[in-house]
Swiss-Prot record:
It holds the Pfam family HAAS. Keywords: Cell membrane, Membrane, Transmembrane, Transmembrane helix. Its main location: membrane. GO terms for cellular component: plasma membrane. It is found in: Cell membrane. The chain crosses the membrane at residues 89-106, 111-128, 149-168, 172-194. This is Uncharacterized protein YitQ. It is a multi-pass membrane protein. The lineage of its organism: Bacteria, Bacillati, Bacillota, Bacilli, Bacillales.
Length: 195
């Protein structure tokens, strides 16, 4: 059984699919992923998987190279990549406007821009499955496609929950709002560390 051949083939296909990605970014992503795949393959070889089962296990855990490349490039293509950069800029502009608008609003409505921003951010996380904004994700290992989708869904729900808490804050005691935010934050980061 030649696990190295399976790893090399997978990495070659992924490298070809990531041709539009900048060289340094592509090399870093491939090097990091190769370490994860190598450890995964070695564990499966010790478990006694055949070469065919090993190939299937790699693709089920890490996705097909084309799917993984599309995910890494923000759903693929240079035009989509440019569009996603515009999307990130749009979110940054929204955050700046939110910060500027806060002192201009009456005190009863100062929570609204932040709640709207959290809702937009939740939609972005749900649709794009971008997890790097969550600090707990950055420090952890590479995750499979299924875990990324699950964490993005839970993260989007978490952000929406925070937005709803902010919208309800005029009707709730400040201590209750603070406790809801603290408990939900702790629960979300506990979820990330367990995953």
């Amino acid at each position: 059984m030649n696990g190295q051949l399976i790893i090399d083939r997978y990495m070659e296909e992924l490298n070809a699919e990531l041709a539009n990605m900048p060289d340094v970014e592509r090399e870093n992503a491939i090097d990091e992923l190769k370490g994860h795949i190598t450890a995964f393959v070695q564990d499966r070889i010790k478990a006694g998987l055949s070469e065919e089962e090993l190939q299937e296990a790699v693709e089920s855990e890490f996705s097909h190279p084309k799917e993984l490349a599309e995910l890494m490039m923000g759903d693929g293509g240079e035009t989509k990549r440019r569009r996603s950069l515009l999307g990130k800029s749009w979110i940054s502009v929204l955050l700046i406007v939110t910060i500027i608008a806060l002192p201009l609003l009456p005190s009863d409505f100062r929570h609204l821009p932040l709640a709207v921003y959290l809702m937009v951010l939740a939609g972005y996380v749900w649709k794009r499955k971008k997890l790097v904004m969550f600090a707990g994700v950055r420090k952890n290992k590479m995750r499979s496609q299924k875990e990324i989708v699950k964490i993005s869904r839970v993260g989007a729900v978490y952000l929406l929950f925070l937005a709803v808490v902010l919208l309800l804050s005029p009707f709730l005691n400040a201590l209750v709002v603070l406790l809801l935010i603290a408990v939900s934050c702790a629960a979300f980061f506990l979820f990330l560390n367990i995953k």
